[in-house]
């Protein structure tokens, strides 16, 4: 069973940690990472903008960031440790309002997106990889009980 830790550095938007943890567990199991370790951090815009600036040199907030532990020189030291997914709760709320989706469904979408990056998917590596990642995103969202069509706005913008 995956080991999942959830922390928050925001308090303005109520999140359901139990539901997030359950969704992460289901996603990891579906991807075959049954013994994985994952850290999820839920932040506000200010914290996310700081992380985005530090690690991506972009001076703005973003929806989700992933920090894989399985890359680089020491990536094979502890293969079950996947890394960290950082989700911006205010951004998720705004995205839901803009596209007529619930906050929780957008949180699930961003969680799927972040975990897929941790396990090697990268929509920025060309159209083929973007399409594979989009297909896997839709598959996992359906598994979580969402209508994949309701997220076309997000997936279409990833290539």
Curated annotation (Swiss-Prot):
<protein>
    <recommendedName>
        <fullName>Endoribonuclease YbeY</fullName>
        <ecNumber>3.1.-.-</ecNumber>
    </recommendedName>
</protein>
<keyword id="KW-0862">Zinc</keyword>
<keyword id="KW-0690">Ribosome biogenesis</keyword>
<keyword id="KW-0963">Cytoplasm</keyword>
<keyword id="KW-0479">Metal-binding</keyword>
<comment type="similarity">
    <text>Belongs to the endoribonuclease YbeY family.</text>
</comment>
<dbReference type="GO" id="GO:0004222">
    <property type="term" value="F:metalloendopeptidase activity"/>
</dbReference>
<keyword id="KW-0378">Hydrolase</keyword>
<dbReference type="GO" id="GO:0006364">
    <property type="term" value="P:rRNA processing"/>
</dbReference>
<feature type="binding site">
    <location>
        <position position="123"/>
    </location>
    <ligand>
        <name>Zn(2+)</name>
    </ligand>
</feature>
<feature type="binding site">
    <location>
        <position position="117"/>
    </location>
    <ligand>
        <name>Zn(2+)</name>
    </ligand>
</feature>
<keyword id="KW-0698">rRNA processing</keyword>
<dbReference type="Pfam" id="PF02130">
    <property type="entry name" value="YbeY"/>
</dbReference>
<dbReference type="InterPro" id="IPR002036">
    <property type="entry name" value="YbeY"/>
</dbReference>
<dbReference type="GO" id="GO:0005737">
    <property type="term" value="C:cytoplasm"/>
</dbReference>
<dbReference type="InterPro" id="IPR020549">
    <property type="entry name" value="YbeY_CS"/>
</dbReference>
<dbReference type="GO" id="GO:0008270">
    <property type="term" value="F:zinc ion binding"/>
</dbReference>
<comment type="function">
    <text>Single strand-specific metallo-endoribonuclease involved in late-stage 70S ribosome quality control and in maturation of the 3' terminus of the 16S rRNA.</text>
</comment>
<keyword id="KW-0255">Endonuclease</keyword>
<keyword id="KW-0540">Nuclease</keyword>
<feature type="binding site">
    <location>
        <position position="113"/>
    </location>
    <ligand>
        <name>Zn(2+)</name>
    </ligand>
</feature>
<dbReference type="GO" id="GO:0004521">
    <property type="term" value="F:RNA endonuclease activity"/>
</dbReference>
<dbReference type="InterPro" id="IPR023091">
    <property type="entry name" value="MetalPrtase_cat_dom_sf_prd"/>
</dbReference>
């Amino acid at each position: 069973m995956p080991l999942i830790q959830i922390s928050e550095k925001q308090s303005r938007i109520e999140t359901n940690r139990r539901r997030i943890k359950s969704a992460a567990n289901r996603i990891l199991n579906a991807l075959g990472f049954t013994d994985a370790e994952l850290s999820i951090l839920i932040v506000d815009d200010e914290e996310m903008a700081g992380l985005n600036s530090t690690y991506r040199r972009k001076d703005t907030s973003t929806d989700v960031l992933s920090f894989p532990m399985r890359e680089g020189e020491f990536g094979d030291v502890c293969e079950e440790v996947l890394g960290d997914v950082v989700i911006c709760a205010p951004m998720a709320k705004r995205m839901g309002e803009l596209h007529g989706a619930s906050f929780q469904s957008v949180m699930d979408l961003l969680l799927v997106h972040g975990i897929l990056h941790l396990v090697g998917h990268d929509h920025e590596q060309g159209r083929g990889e973007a399409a594979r990642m989009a297909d896997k995103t839709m598959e996992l969202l359906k598994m979580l009980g969402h209508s994949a069509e309701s997220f076309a706005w997000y997936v279409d913008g990833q290539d």
